[in-house]
């Protein structure tokens, strides 16, 4: 039963994550392409869907009988993205940073001429968590087949992988 709920939650997560990333491109591109501008409303909606999808995937991971498939690394990245998503929604609705400062700061980083860091502790928290996520995603993607092989090995009772001894 959990797989029937986990798969749609996972797809919703990945699709909404994509739209949120596309929405954030407006802070890193000047001029902003029309396709990015056209997708802005979807990105806003996707931010809320992302939070709900993350919560559902995390709950299914926590309460599913297939805990052997979930590593601490999975919990770490889910929690990290959940915190990034939550802080982003809080900034969108309650603690709005100055978006002109955010864009100037982002473009300054990309052009190696940094601007002043926008004020607001929540933005700094959100930004630092995103910086932590960026290098983690490629290693998470490349390690995914090994995690699945490890889970299958444990399911068959073949013991631990060599790195866990």
What are these regions (language model features)?
Residues 163-165:
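Terminal, Lys/Arg-rich, intrinsically disordered segments and adjacent short helical elements
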Residues 1-107, 115-125, 133-143, 147-160:
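Long, contiguous internal "core" modules enriched in hydrophobic/ aromatic residues
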